[in-house]
Structure formats: C-alpha cells, structure tokens
Amino acid sequence: MYPAHLLVLLAVCVSLLGATAIPPLPLNLVQFSNLIQCVNKGSRASYHYADYGCYCGAGGSGTPVDELDRCCKIHDDCYGEAEKMGCYPKWTLYTYDCSTEEPNCSTKTGCQGFVCACDLEAAKCFARSPYNNKNYNIDTSKRCK
C-alpha cells in the first residue's frame, strides 16, 4: 500500500472516531427544524431558536422574555401534554405538507397528529413573532426567574 493511501485511511478512521462522540439529535427535532424552515420560508435559520430567551432550547423556567419566547413555552407545554397522553414527542415522527401556501399536518390523529400540531403551531408562532437579537444566548440564571 502506498503511504498516501495509508494517510487517507488514517484520516477517515480518525474522523469517524470523532463523529461517534457526537450524540444524534432526536429525529423529531430535525423534523421540527425542517417544519420551521417550511413555515418561515427560510427567512431565519432554525438554529436561531435553539438558544433564545428562557424557553427556546433545552429546558425552560421563569417568565418568557417576549412573544417569541412565549411561543417556545407554549410548545414546551404542548409537548408536556403529549407526554401525559403517553407520547414521546421528541421521537415521534409525522408527515406534513409543505408544498402549499399554508403548511399542514398530513397526520391528523394519535401521537403523530398531536405532536405535528404542536410543532406546526410553534413554527407559525415563530414566523409571526419578532426576533430580538438581545434575547439570543441570554444568561438564563439571571433573566429567567
């Protein structure tokens, strides 16, 4: 084997080892991200909502800082209701239609329908709510009491 081939093989192996340390996102969160992009027509990348205010992102506490943060609290509460129904919202996959002017859930019943409705309402709420850069990546220990 040529030395150049060994270097390429080594680089591939090292990169694969690094990739195994990255935990996968729950499948529904990837789908939710795509639904956000569908509703807002790509005007703001989904990751902007992952660390916004007190409720957008993992966890949540205190009083929402603005309308957009209230959207996230409502979404968290909706997922809480789904869990009470025995659903696993972060892992529940559903189908939706993005080809129309008004995106909608193709799945209407059961856990899939409920979780899709949670995500669709949140995505619509995000699209109509102003985004304040000052509320991105805030110190939640000080502002979310």
Swiss-Prot record:
Positions that bind Ca(2+): Y55, G57, G59, D76
Keywords annotated in UniProt: Calcium, Disulfide bond, Hydrolase, Lipid degradation, Lipid metabolism, Metal-binding, Secreted, Signal
The enzyme's E.C. designation: 3.1.1.4
Sample GO molecular function, one term: phospholipid binding
Protein name: Acidic phospholipase A2 1
Alphabetized InterPro entries for the sequence: PLipase_A2, PLipase_A2_Asp_AS, PLipase_A2_dom, PLipase_A2_dom_sf, PLipase_A2_His_AS
Complex and partners: Monomer.
Group of enzyme by EC: hydrolase
Active site: H75, D119
Major location category of this protein: secreted
Pfam family membership, one: Phospholip_A2_1
Catalytic reactions of this protein: a 1,2-diacyl-sn-glycero-3-phosphocholine + H2O = a 1-acyl-sn-glycero-3-phosphocholine + a fatty acid + H(+)
Tissues in which the protein is found: Expressed by the venom gland.
Record's subcellular location: Secreted
Propeptide: 22-27
UniProt remark on cofactor binding: Binds 1 Ca(2+) ion.
Annotated site residues (Specific activity reduced 20-fold by modification) in this chain: W91
GO annotations of cellular component type: extracellular region
Function per UniProt: PLA2 catalyzes the calcium-dependent hydrolysis of the 2-acyl groups in 3-sn-phosphoglycerides.
GO biological process terms, semicolon-separated: arachidonate secretion; lipid catabolic process; phospholipid metabolic process
Record-annotated disulphide pairs: C38-C98, C54-C144, C56-C72, C71-C125, C78-C118, C87-C111, C105-C116
Cofactors, names only: Ca(2+)
Signal peptide segment: 1-21
Family from the record: Belongs to the phospholipase A2 family. Group I subfamily. D49 sub-subfamily.
Organism encoding this protein: Laticauda semifasciata (Black-banded sea krait)
